[in-house]
């Protein structure tokens, strides 16, 4: 037991953690200190204040119940411990966030390209009197693209994490305390350890307090534990676990009923809420899968660019080019490899999907989270409100020795039961009179099930059920006016009220409560309207029914009544409920049972089934009771029919659990793990549970345990999605690869910690999100393969220009017209492509093996389709030059004469003279034709990019945005070359319409080639073609 001296030694240490041994001072780095603090916060809550004797507690804190703390001790404690407030975490400055968007990932590649362009232009400016401005224009355009895209991304993600601000909203503003024998109201931040505080209905608890006096106090712990029912408090120490014990109330939870006096035992960061706040804000969530994919893609593109650039630098030097010329070639090749429009395409594609998901009730806070959900392999789902409706409903009744399913439909069209039974009529009447819930006013036109009520969840469920089954409850209560009442308390576990009888001068006593407590006060039971002695055979039937309903995870209440004798209790009798009652609470007549449950949402079983077929493991993680959790898990299919837990096997074999053999234990594919088991669990043990069982339920879990479960799944290599709505979920939401908060029932804290918010709180919406996430990953692959394919016909002219000395077939500005002009809308249109039929039948992608950009994609884009496109471009180029007198064989090695400004009489293949100006005009016409041919072959590339496996004839052409993309790129290409002024500025020339035609056969060839490739993919799954070309 602690002594008073302990208090001084504590200082500001977190006394939840194990006390540290004194050692020689040791310098600890800030990083290590933060890591140690985080590890400490992850530990289970440890405290002894709830188990200490009250005298010892008062002595330790130098306080008393009569006078409270003295002002001297308050001042000392304030100086030592600081204010009762949460320490705000270090905020990332907005300019740092902006710079991350501007220079992170793909943007850096474009910045390097822009800098190289400016460098190349600088070399030209120093060397030439009239330098070519292409590199300068390209550098400027690249810079503008990065700045615009960076600003757009920053704007999209500006709603950054504000977790601690949400916690601040939960902090109570004022507290009523006892100091120097006087009750005073103070700012809650001024509360100190040892303060005696007074709490009443409607207050927010100002700190973690030990209850020392209590009158029916109930607190809403849902934000901390996930339990939707208000929890009663008491002065008794009832559990070793501080979260479970009744004599503690926690900082920022709400008092919903009664009054209490308590002693402050923890303030600020040391409170349970403070620990969760610091844990949530201290966790790093790491890079998203799509960010890692883009990083991987950058490595590939950079590797290819640098390899080609350096190779041709060496080749050009070996061929006798001047070193300055060779460096310009190097820069040109590297820049030509940069897909300038891809950053904007990826950002826009993710934004479009985010908007699509918002229409389906998934609000995405961070763009990259769109794809993360599609990569998810494990979903750790909360139970209350996500899998269930967060609305207690009467599910079953037991009367006349039968279990009957309750009909809670609005029009009473569900399963019918005998409403003519006199027992049922008595049970319904008593349920109506016992329920203290009431409908809020001005809701006459609202359906019963949608009406708002005052009262706790169970009372509300009874009120609505009786209203639907019998009729107007308020009329029943008005005709049977309440005379007196003994409220429910945690000791008696029942509630009693006495009512005037309708059309009679007598009184009716009614009771509801824990079935075993109600039954022990009864001597008779009503069966088929007749009162009969309560015999053993009836009690046995009752016990079986009680066990069955309890086994379904339902909350069971018992009901009884007693007609008070008129001669002993005449009209006007004064009933006493304090101390000794003057009316009987024994020898009552038992009526039956009502059982309630928070029912599963209708769409959830189908959603869980879809997850299973998509290879996603759904794990339930809840703060609720294991029996309830297991029942809901079975109801929604998380534990599927036929799969058993170890307890089920032992029950079926009728043997003790410990007697199960290893083989029998291994045959249990499902398991329900109590949070207590996770308290001191080693990583290896948790990993074994996660590996050995396909269907898992974690019940009675703390925030720290939820976090441990997420980390355990991530150790297995899983991409983890976590759903939650309470403050207790925020650390797990933050740590998960994608945190999904509830929009309706979710706390502000959980919403800020999450990456995505479900606007309808429905688990089925997550499955929709998974499908959209998988679809955008597929469609991003299609956009990238489409965009990268045109890189080869863009790079190869430059390489031919260097290697074979031909006139430049494609200019730098023309490349920009493709990457930032004609290719942009078609690439974005692929984001609208519908899912291929197998999208939710395949397993989640493996982040290590299944890359966004892999060798097969590069091989197809560069080595196959890209080569065909380059051939088409050169075919058109050579045709036009041949038509103008320069045969292909004559062009090789002609570059130095062609670009010589002083040579104005260059002879062509047929002996005609060409001035420098004439040559440049035909060169620009050839570049325009090359550009136009790329657009024509990109038609086929866009169409084949629609699917990765299916035939176009299976997929169809129903993507109207893509159809518009085909028209757009054609119209834009025509506009750029035929509009006076625009064509001059972009160094394009209007050309004969016949020169659009040479690319058409190649376009058809690309389409036929890829149809055959995909046909072979479908015919021989897993064969050579799939291994080499399926991207």
Swiss-Prot record:
It is a multi-pass membrane protein. Residues 1-33 are annotated as: Disordered. It holds the Pfam family Cation_ATPase. It is an enzyme of class 7 (translocase). Residues 24-33 have a biased composition (Basic residues). The active site is at 382 (4-aspartylphosphate intermediate). ATP binds at residue 512. Mg(2+) binds at residues 725, 729. Keywords: ATP-binding, Cell membrane, Ion transport, Magnesium, Membrane, Metal-binding, Nucleotide-binding, Phosphoprotein, Potassium, Potassium transport, Sodium, Sodium transport, Sodium/potassium transport, Translocase, Transmembrane, Transmembrane helix, Transport. InterPro entries: ATPase_P-typ_cation-transptr_C (IPR006068), ATPase_P-typ_cation-transptr_N (IPR004014), ATPase_P-typ_cyto_dom_N (IPR023299), ATPase_P-typ_P_site (IPR018303), ATPase_P-typ_TM_dom_sf (IPR023298), ATPase_P-typ_transduc_dom_A_sf (IPR008250), Cation_transp_ATPase_P-type (IPR050510), HAD-like_sf (IPR036412). One of its GO terms (cellular component) is plasma membrane. One of its GO terms (molecular function) is ATP hydrolysis activity. It is found in: Cell membrane. This is the catalytic component of the active enzyme, which catalyzes the hydrolysis of ATP coupled with the exchange of sodium and potassium ions across the plasma membrane. This action creates the electrochemical gradient of sodium and potassium ions, providing the energy for active transport of various nutrients. The sodium/potassium-transporting ATPase is composed of a catalytic alpha subunit, an auxiliary non-catalytic beta subunit and an additional regulatory subunit. This is Sodium/potassium-transporting ATPase subunit alpha. It comes from Hydra vulgaris. The lineage of its organism: Eukaryota, Metazoa, Cnidaria, Hydrozoa, Hydroidolina.
């Amino acid at each position: 037991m602690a002594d008073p001296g302990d208090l001084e030694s504590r200082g500001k240490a977190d006394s939840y953690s194990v006390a540290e041994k004194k050692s020689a001072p040791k310098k600890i780095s800030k990083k290590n200190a933060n890591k140690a603090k985080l590890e400490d916060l992850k530990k289970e809550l440890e405290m002894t204040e709830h188990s200490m004797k009250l005298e010892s507690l008062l002595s330790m804190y130098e306080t008393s119940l009569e006078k409270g703390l003295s002002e001297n001790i308050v001042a000392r404690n304030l100086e030592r411990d600081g204010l009762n407030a949460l320490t705000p975490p270090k905020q990332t400055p907005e300019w740092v966030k902006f710079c991350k968007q501007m220079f992170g990932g793909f943007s850096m590649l474009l910045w390097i390209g822009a800098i190289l362009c400016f460098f190349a232009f600088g070399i030209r400016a120093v060397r030439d009197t009239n330098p070519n401005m292409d590199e300068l224009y390209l550098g400027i355009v690249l810079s503008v693209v990065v700045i615009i895209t960076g600003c757009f991304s920053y704007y999209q993600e500006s709603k950054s994490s504000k977790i601690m601000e949400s916690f601040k909203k939960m902090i109570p503003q004022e507290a009523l305390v006892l100091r120097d024998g006087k009750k005073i109201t103070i700012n809650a931040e001024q509360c100190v350890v040892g303060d005696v505080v007074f709490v009443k209905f409607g207050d927010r608890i100002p700190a973690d307090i030990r209850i020392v006096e209590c009158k029916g106090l109930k607190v809403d712990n849902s934000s901390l534990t996930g339990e939707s029912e208000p929890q009663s408090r008491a002065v008794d120490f009832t559990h070793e676990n501080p979260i479970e014990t009744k004599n503690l109330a926690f900082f920022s939870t709400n008092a919903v009923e009664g009054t209490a006096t308590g002693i402050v035992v923890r303030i600020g960061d040391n409170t349970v809420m403070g620990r969760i706040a610091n844990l949530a804000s201290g966790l790093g969530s790491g890079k998203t899968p799509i960010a890692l994919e883009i990083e991987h893609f950058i490595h590939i593109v950079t590797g290819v660019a640098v390899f080609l650039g350096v190779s041709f630098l060496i080749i050009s030097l070996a061929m006798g080019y001047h070193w300055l010329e060779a460096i310009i070639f190097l820069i040109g090749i590297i820049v030509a490899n940069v897909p300038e429009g891809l950053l904007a395409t990826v950002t826009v594609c993710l934004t479009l999907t985010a908007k699509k998901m918002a229409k389906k009730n998934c609000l995405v806070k961070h763009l990259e989270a769109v794809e993360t959900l599609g990569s998810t392999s494990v979903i750790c789902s909360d139970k209350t409100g996500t899998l269930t409706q967060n609305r207690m409903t009467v599910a079953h009744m037991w009367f006349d020795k039968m279990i009957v399913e309750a009909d809670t439909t609005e029009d009473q069209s569900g399963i019918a039961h005998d409403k003519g039974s006199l027992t049922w009529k008595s049970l319904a009447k008593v349920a109506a009179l016992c329920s203290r819930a009431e409908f809020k006013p001005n809701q006459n036109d609202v359906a019963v099930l949608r009406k708002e009520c005052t009262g706790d969840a169970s009372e509300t469920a009874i009120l609505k059920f009786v209203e639907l089954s019998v009729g107007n409850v308020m009329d029943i209560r008005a005709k049977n006016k309440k005379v007196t009442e003994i409220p429910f308390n945690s000791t008696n576990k029942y509630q009693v009220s006495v009512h005037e009888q309708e059309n009679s001068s007598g009184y009716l006593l009614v009771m509801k409560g824990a079935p075993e407590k109600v039954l022990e006060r009864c001597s008779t039971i009503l069966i088929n309207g007749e009162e009969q002695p309560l015999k053993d055979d009836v009690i046995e039937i009752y016990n079986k029914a009680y066990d069955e309903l309890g086994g379904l995870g339902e909350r069971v209440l018992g009901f009884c009544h007693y007609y008070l004798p008129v001669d002993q209790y005449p009209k006007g009798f004064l009933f006493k409920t304090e101390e000794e009652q003057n009316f009987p609470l024994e020898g009552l007549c038992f009526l039956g049972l009502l059982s309630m449950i928070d029912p599963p949402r209708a769409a959830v079983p189908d959603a869980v089934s879809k997850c299973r077929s998509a290879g996603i493991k759904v794990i339930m993680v809840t703060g609720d009771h294991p029996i309830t959790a297991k029942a809901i898990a079975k109801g929604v299919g998380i534990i599927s029919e036929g799969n058993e837990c170890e307890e089920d096997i032992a029950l079926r074999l009728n043997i003790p659990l410990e007697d199960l053999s290893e083989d029998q234990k291994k045959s249990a594919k499902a398991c329900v793990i109590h949070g207590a088991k996770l308290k001191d669990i080693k990583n290896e043990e948790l990993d074994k549970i996660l590996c050995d069982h396909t269907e898992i339920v974690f019940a009675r879990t703390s925030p720290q345990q939820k976090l441990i479960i997420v980390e355990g799944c991530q150790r297995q290599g899983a991409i983890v999605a976590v759903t939650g709505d309470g403050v207790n979920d925020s650390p797990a939401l933050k740590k998960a690869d994608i945190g999904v908060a509830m929009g309706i029932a979710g706390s502000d804290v959980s919403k800020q910690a999450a990456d995505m918010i479900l606007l309808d709180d429905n688990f089925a919406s997550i499955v929709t999100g998974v499908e959209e996430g998988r679809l955008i990953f597929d469609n991003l692959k299609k956009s990238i393969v489409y965009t990268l394919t045109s890189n080869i016909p863009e790079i190869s002219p430059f390489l031919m220009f260097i290697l074979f000395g031909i006139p430049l077939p494609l200019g730098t500005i023309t490349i920009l017209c493709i990457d930032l002009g004609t290719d942009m809308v078609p690439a974005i249109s692929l984001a609208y492509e519908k899912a291929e039929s197998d999208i939710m039948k395949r397993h989640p992608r493996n982040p290590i093996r299944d890359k966004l950009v892999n060798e097969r994609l590069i091989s197809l884009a560069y080595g196959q389709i890209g080569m065909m496109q380059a051939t088409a471009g050169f075919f058109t180029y050579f045709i036009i030059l041949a038509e103008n007198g320069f045969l292909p064989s004559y062009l090789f090695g002609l570059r130095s004469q062609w670009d010589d400004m002083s040579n104005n009489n260059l002879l062509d293949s047929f002996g005609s003279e060409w001035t420098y100006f004439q040559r440049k005009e035909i060169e620009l016409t050839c570049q325009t034709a090359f550009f136009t041919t790329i657009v024509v072959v990109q038609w086929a590339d866009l169409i084949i990019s629609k699917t990765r496996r299916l035939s176009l004839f299976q997929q169809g052409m129903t993507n109207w945005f893509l159809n518009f993309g085909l028209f757009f790129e054609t119209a834009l290409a025509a506009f750029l070359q035929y509009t006076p002024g625009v064509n001059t500025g972009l160094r394009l020339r209007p050309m004969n319409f016949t020169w659009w035609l040479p690319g058409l056969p190649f376009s058809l060839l690309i389409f036929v080639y890829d149809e055959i490739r995909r046909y072979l993919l479908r015919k021989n799954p897993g064969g050579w073609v799939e291994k080499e070309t399926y991207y």
